[in-house]
Amino acid sequence: MKAVQRIFQTGRFSVAAGPSVRFQAGFLAANRQVRFSSNHGVSLEEINTKYNDFFSNVQDQFELQRGLNNCFAYDIVPSSDVIEQALRAARRVNDFPTAVRIFEGIKVKLPTKEQYQAYVKELKPVCNELGIVLKEDLFK
C-alpha cells in the first residue's frame, strides 16, 4: 500500500506499482476514445428541411427541447427559417423560457457578434409578433 501511495504522490506509474494500479491505469487509457460524427454526407438543405418539418409539428415541450438539442448538435448554425419555426413551436407549447434560450444557443454557435446581430435583426419581426424578448433586452 505504501508503494502505491508513493507512486501516486510522485505522479509516476512504474513497474513497482501493484497489478491493480497497472490495470487501472491501462483501463483508463483504453477508455479514451475519439468519437466522430456519422453524418458526414448531410447537407445544409437537408438539415433545414428536416428541422423545419420537425418544429412545425412539435406538440409538447419535451419534443421541442429534444429537437433543439439535436439541431444545435450539428457543427452548423441553423438557418433563420429553422429558428423561426422553433420560436413558433416554443410559443405554441407556451414555453417562453425556451424561446429566449434559442437566441442564447445561436449566440454561442456564432463566432462574431455581428453575425448574431444579423440573426436578431432578421428575426425581430417574428419576435415582436410572438412577444419574445431577448435576454439582452430583459436585463437592461
Curated annotation (Swiss-Prot):
**Entry function:** Component of the cytochrome c oxidase, the last enzyme in the mitochondrial electron transport chain which drives oxidative phosphorylation. The respiratory chain contains 3 multisubunit complexes succinate dehydrogenase (complex II, CII), ubiquinol-cytochrome c oxidoreductase (cytochrome b-c1 complex, complex III, CIII) and cytochrome c oxidase (complex IV, CIV), that cooperate to transfer electrons derived from NADH and succinate to molecular oxygen, creating an electrochemical gradient over the inner membrane that drives transmembrane transport and the ATP synthase.
Q: Where in the cell is it found?
A: Mitochondrion inner membrane
Q: Which InterPro entries match?
A: Cyt_c_oxidase_su5A/6, Cyt_c_oxidase_su5A/6_sf
List the Gene3D superfamilies: Cytochrome c oxidase, subunit Va/VI
How this chain sits in the membrane, per its record, is: Peripheral membrane protein
Q: Give one Pfam family.
A: COX5A
Keyword Membrane listed: yes
Gene Ontology BP terms: mitochondrial electron transport, cytochrome c to oxygen; proton transmembrane transport
Q: How does it assemble?
A: Component of the cytochrome c oxidase (complex IV, CIV), a multisubunit enzyme composed of a catalytic core of 3 subunits and several supernumerary subunits. The complex exists as a monomer or a dimer and forms supercomplexes (SCs) in the inner mitochondrial membrane with ubiquinol-cytochrome c oxidoreductase (cytochrome b-c1 complex, complex III, CIII).
What's the protein here called?
A: Cytochrome c oxidase subunit 6, mitochondrial
The molecular function terms in GO held by this entry are: metal ion binding
Q: What is its main location?
A: mitochondrion
> Mind naming one GO cellular-component term on file for this protein?
mitochondrial inner membrane
Q: Which residues form the signal peptide?
A: none
The Swiss-Prot or TrEMBL record describes its family as follows: Belongs to the cytochrome c oxidase subunit 5A family.
Q: List the disulfide bonds.
A: none
Alphabetic keyword roster: Heme, Iron, Membrane, Metal-binding, Mitochondrion, Mitochondrion inner membrane, Transit peptide
Pathway membership, UniProt: Energy metabolism; oxidative phosphorylation
According to its UniProt entry, this protein's organism is Schizosaccharomyces pombe (strain 972 / ATCC 24843) (Fission yeast)
